[in-house]
Amino acid sequence: MNTYTQKINGDLWLVEDDRDNLKISYRIKEIIAEEQSDFQHVMIVDSYDFGRTLVLDGVVQTTSSDGHIYNEMITHIPLSIHPNAKKVLIIGGGDCGAACEAAKYEQLETIDQVEIDESVVKLSLEHLPEVSGRLSDPRVNFLFADGMEYIKQNKNTYDVIIVDSSDPVGFAEALFAKSFYQDIYDSLKTDGLMVCQSMSPFLNKAITSQTYGRIGEIFPYHKLYIATVPTYPGALWSFTIGSKKHQNIYVESFDKQTKYVNDNILQSCFELPAFLQEFV
């Protein structure tokens, strides 16, 4: 048995214990698949409350129950702001959920996904179809490489860049650095925009504020928006957009088939509670 699951009173549990002040446990039915990649331990489990779950180094990343919320929010919001996106880059997002949502836009010509760990993509496509959709769209190009190095080699290339990173721990920490956001800016076309997840403003307020501030120092326009993702610690999750030109939702009527995003969500997600308005 791996070090992330344990038997308690005869039941199998996944125990997240990477935080000093908070531990979260999930009772699971079985381990569907797991492997140790060159970068991390990758595991798919079947949990009682949240269904099939992608776990990286013992930390839940997405589930078949609520993964659509995060993936729809990190994808449809920026693609509803840019009026004529043709070329999209996704950095990270190995569960393929963001790419699956982006593929719903027929006007997109290219969806490049740069994921450092091929094992995450392989296991998600095989064992997590509720999130990955077993993606097979020919416009999606999987590039197994370091996203930070990739964008340095591709200047003025993309209309929209989606940074679907894990939490800022280990090799993912660099995806929250100001220098990385500058490289993203340089990789975008003159009217391009980017989005990244900026953590829970409840449990990680400093990171949310720092991310919003760093992007605001580089991009002429930046906005914070929120969604509720039950499996993420703190539940309330934030996303930050940085844009060279476009600021507002341009679609008159949202017509994509989704479970969470609709016309009302496109607008209301930018309405922030008072405690968040203090630093935005």
Write out the residue ranges for each language-model feature.
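A general beta-strand register signal
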Residues: 55-56
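Structural detector of well-ordered beta-strand residues that form the stable sheet scaffold
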Residues: 194-195, 223
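Conserved Class I S-adenosyl-L-methionine
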Residues: 181-182, 207-229, 240
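N-terminal glycine-rich anion-binding loops that anchor highly charged ligand groups
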Residues: 42-52
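The AdoMet/dcAdoMet-binding core of the Class I SAM-like
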Residues: 2-13, 62-193, 203-212
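SAM/dcSAM-binding transferase cores
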Residues: 2-43, 213, 234-280
